[in-house]
Amino acid sequence: MKEETKQNILNSLVSGKSLTTVLSAKAKEFMFESVQNELVTKYETDGWEVYKRYKTSIRMQRRKPMDMAFEDDVWALFARMGFSFLNKDRNFRLPYSNDEKLTQQIDIFVADEETILIIECKVAGNPKQSNFKETIEAIGGKKEGLITTIQQLFPDTKYKIKFIFATKNYYLSEQDNARLNNYGIIHFDEETLKYYQELTKHLGTSAKYQLLGSIFEGQTIPELDNRIPAIKGKMGGYTYYSFSIEPEKLLKIGYVLHRNKANRKLMPTYQRLIKKSRLKSVQDFVDNGGFFPNSIIINIDTNGKSVRFDSAGNQVEKSISRIGILHLPKKYRSAYIIDGQHRLYGYANSPYKATNCIPVVAFINLQRTQQVKLFMQINENQKAVPKNLRNTLNSDLLWNSENLTEQIKIGRA
C-alpha cells in the first residue's frame, strides 16, 4: 500500500477529543450549518429552518435523513462503548484490491487495541421484507480484500476483525440469513441494537465485554493466561472448582444471559439487565478499598469436553477435594455468569480489576435449564439481614470508633 493512501485512510479516522466532538454531532437529531444572511432563503427551500440568529450569520438546522440518523445512532453506540478509533464521516473508503483506486465505501469503521468492526447499515421507514442478495454478496466478495487492507494499515497488530450487517425495520429472509452465515457476517437487527444501547447506558464502556463475547463466541483469546490454582470438589452431585481470579480475566471470557429479545436464540435466559446505580455503588465500594468475600457463581462451557485439571503432587488423604491447576478455556463467552454480575462488572472500570482477586465457584457444562434452576435456588434462598440485627451489629462495630460522626450515630458521644 502506498504511504499516501495509508495516511489518507488514517486521517479519515477520529479518536480522543476529535471523536468526542464528532459524537456530539452524531448524537443529535438535527444537522446544523452556519450560513450568511443572503443564503437563508435558499436553505429554507431545501428544508432547513432557522435555529439561531447571530450578528454576521444564521445557524440553520434540518432533521437528519433516515439513513444518516440510523448510521449515526449505530456509530454513537460503538463510540460510547469505548472504541478508540471510528470513521470521521460517511465518506470513509477502503481499498479492496491491489489496484488502490478500487475502494469500498464503509458506513461505520470501528477499532480499538484488539478489535476492528466493519458495519453496513440499512434502514426502512416501516417494517418490511427486502432482498439483500446483492448487498450481502458485495460485502462477502470484498471481505478478504478489505481484511488485507486492514493488515497493511496495521502490520504490527493482529486484529480480530468482524463484519456486521445492521438493519432497522427489515425482516431478513432465510436466504439472506444463510448468505450472512456463509460469509461470516453477523446480523444486528433493531432489537439487538436496542439491547446494546440499553446495556451501554447502564455499563458504559464495560458493555464492550458483552459485545465481544457475543460476536467472537468460541474464538481464542491467545494472550489470556488461563492457568488458575483451584480446588476440585463435589456438591449436590455436581463437580465444581473453587478458585480466585483477577476480574479482568473473567470479564474477557464471561457472558451474562440477559432476558431480552436480542438473546432469544439463547433461551432460556435468566438474568435481568445490570442496574447502573447498583454498578456504580459497587465500583465506588471497591475503589475505596471494599471487597466482597462471597463467590461469584459461573458455568464453564467447554462444548461437552472435559476441562483440564492438573492435580498437585501433595494431596490430603481421604479428602474428597483435590488441589491443582485448572485450565480455563481461552475463548470468548466460555464462562456464563450465574450469580454475581454486579460484583464482577463493578470491577470493569476499576483500577483494581488486574490487581485484585475475586472468589469464584465454577460448574462445568451445565445445561441452560440447570443454570436457570441454580440461579433461582440462589436468589430464592437468600435472605437480607433483618433491620433490627443490622442496627445491633452496626452499634457493636461503631462502639469503639474514634470517629465523632460514627459515635453520634449510636448515641455514644
Q: Which residue stretches match the model-derived regions?
A:
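Basic- and aromatic-enriched surface patches that contact anionic nucleotides/nucleic acids
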Residues: 292-304, 310-412
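Amphipathic alpha-helical segments that form well-ordered structural scaffolds
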Residues: 73-80, 281, 285, 346
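Intrinsically disordered, low-complexity Ser/Thr/Pro/Gly-rich regulatory segments
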Residues: 1-222
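N-terminal leader or domain-start segments enriched in small/polar residues
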Residues: 169-331, 362-365
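Short, flexible/disordered intra-domain loops and linkers
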Residues: 98-99, 127-137, 270, 306-313, ...
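Short amphipathic alpha-helices and their capping/turn segments at secondary-structure boundaries
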Residues: 107-112, 282-286, 411
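Short helix-terminating capping/connector loops at secondary-structure junctions
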Residues: 153-160, 290-292, 354-355
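Extended hydrophobic secondary-structure segments that form protein cores and membrane-embedded regions
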Residues: 161-169, 359-363, 413
